[in-house]
Amino acid sequence: KREKFIITLIDGQLVIAGSDRRGTIYGIYELSQQMGVSPWYDWADVPVEHHDSIFVNKGIYTDGEPAVRYRGIFLNDEAPCLTSWVKNTYGTEYGDHRFYQRVFELILRLRGNMMWPAMWSWAFYADDAENEKTADEMGVVMSTSHHEPMARNHQEYARNRKGWGPWN
């Protein structure tokens, strides 16, 4: 089974176990959501509920394996709104690993596992070497759309048009 988790008590200890790394992540975020943390807490300013204590019922909780293998979002038409927000928030002209870490967390909290990165003026792999590493460490599969064959986008080509040899 893939991306499956269980939450249970064993000898009075809370155990969250996943069939794989994303399964474990989903189990942790499920418990977080049951404690009142919205998947959107960071993006939509959803307040996190305060609890003086939490309790876990005996038994095993699981949602089972996802019915759809790849689930995610495509950051489309990001300019000017998202690109301006990133510049004002992080001081960069591109989505760096700090920005994508927040996006990846949202995707995982929503039980997604995939993302198609922004492409107008950004180049996911070329802009910040930490982007790819962050996606891998967080368990998010990167994909590309019609505009980015072989995971390379127009910006990478435009920036290096003269530097890739006579076959351009």
Language-model-detected regions and their locations in the chain:
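Aromatic-lined carbohydrate-binding surfaces of glycoside hydrolases
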Residues: 47, 67-168
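Contiguous, structured surface segment used for ligand recognition
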Residues: 1-65
